[in-house]
């Protein structure tokens, strides 16, 4: 990335595409030249399902940003999250035999882990590698234990991969727009980079991005993404459940979903004094008695299913037992009424709705529309302390830590 050259980032979502164009000067200060949002077509959960429609909608979004910025992009970085993403943790060990640990020892373990990842998932490509921690003779080291005398060295890493064919389809969609893909960045990683503080990422945080058709989970510790998963379940599934069970239209069901109080206390907005759904919610369907218990049980059943899966994913990492772990919910689904209260009860943790949490902390960096794009900008501009950066530029090299410098990753 050359100083003052225009750079672009586009997030590929189910409902909308979001693009930013920016520059970075010689002092590493970024400047946003333009932003654009357009309707997403041909893309489902980060996957290209119709190349023609996807290319057209991507071209429209990028062109709008280019027109506003009065520039023409040659390359662009992609922010996505797919259920097909795989997050794999590796722990590699090497005998040191009482000698000092050298750079070559760590480089060897990194390459061994990469080799195993490529063998295990031959149809996947690596998009992120994170250093979790080092274990020297049974003791945990957060930083590189160079020049430490030891008998054994273990290195724990997290690899995030995605199907090669999915990458090919994304690249083809951009080629059809006469633009190359610079790099691919996990959306949950980008969100965390933008909206969580370093101490939250250091001591343990769980980010739950609740979307329309999917939910993405990111678990962070020691500034590294230690586990992530995307579930093909979202708040639209609640809408479809209500529609199916209550024989209501999707439009009516969505309106009902948006007015459910997820603390499941008395809801006078949605139900009458006899606890039946109010007549005003029957816009396209004939009025009939639908009890509050039926609608609440439908919503609760789907939310419980989703949260139970998330809870199991948190439990297997052990992060839920760490003192001080924070849980945050973000995304369109986090705006459901009092969902954070229900999540807090379910997990046994204090769950913060991120927009509310930001207000309490007097922070202004949370911008719902472009949050993941701004996080990706930060990652691209500054690098990330625990990540092996794909093909870093000479300007970035000065800022990268030892881990990133000794291991280069190519998609």
Where are each of the predicted segments found?
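Acidic-glycine-rich active-site phosphate/pyrophosphate-binding loop
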Residues: 31, 211-213, 342-359
């Amino acid at each position: 990335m050359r100083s003052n050259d225009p750079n672009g980032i586009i997030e590929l979502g189910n409902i909308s595409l979001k693009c930013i164009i920016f520059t970075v000067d010689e002092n590493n200060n970024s400047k946003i030249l333009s932003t654009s949002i357009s309707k997403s077509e041909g893309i489902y959960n980060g996957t290209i399902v119709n190349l023609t429609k996807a290319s057209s909608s991507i071209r429209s979004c990028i062109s709008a940003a280019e027109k506003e910025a009065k520039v023409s992009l040659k390359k662009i970085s992609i922010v996505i999250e797919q259920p097909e993403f795989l997050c794999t943790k590796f722990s590699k060990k090497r005998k040191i035999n009482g000698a000092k640990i050298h750079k070559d020892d760590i480089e060897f373990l990194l390459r061994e882990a990469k080799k195993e990842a490529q063998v295990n998932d031959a149809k996947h490509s690596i998009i992120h590698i994170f250093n979790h921690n080092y274990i020297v003779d049974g003791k945990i080291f957060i930083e590189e234990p160079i020049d430490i005398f030891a008998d054994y060295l273990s290195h724990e890493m997290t690899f995030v991969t995605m199907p090669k064919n999915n990458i090919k389809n994304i690249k083809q969609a951009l080629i059809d727009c006469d633009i190359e893909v610079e790099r691919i960045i996990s959306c949950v990683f980008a969100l965390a980079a933008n909206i969580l503080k370093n101490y939250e990422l250091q001591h343990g945080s769980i980010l739950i991005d609740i979307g329309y058709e999917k939910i993405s989970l990111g678990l962070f510790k020691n500034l590294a993404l230690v586990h992530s998963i995307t579930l093909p379940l979202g708040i639209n599934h609640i809408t479809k459940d209500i529609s199916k069970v209550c024989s209501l239209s999707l439009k009516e069901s969505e309106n009902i979903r948006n007015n459910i109080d997820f603390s499941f206390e008395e809801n006078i907005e949605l139900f009458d004094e006899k606890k039946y759904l109010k007549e005003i919610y029957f816009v396209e369907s004939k009025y009939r008695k639908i009890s509050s218990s039926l609608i609440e049980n439908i919503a609760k059943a789907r939310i419980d299913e989703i949260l139970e899966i998330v809870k199991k994913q948190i439990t297997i990492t052990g992060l839920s037992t760490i003192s001080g772990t924070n849980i945050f919910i973000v995304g369109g689904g986090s705006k459901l009424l009092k969902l954070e209260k229900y999540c807090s009860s379910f997990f046994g943790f204090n769950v913060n709705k991120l927009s509310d949490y930001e207000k309490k902390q007097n922070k202004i960096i949370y911008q719902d529309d472009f949050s993941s794009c701004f996080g990706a900008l930060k990652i691209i501009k500054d690098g990330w302390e625990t990540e092996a950066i794909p093909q870093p530029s000479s300007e970035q090299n000065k800022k990268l830590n030892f881990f990133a410098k000794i291991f280069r990753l190519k998609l």
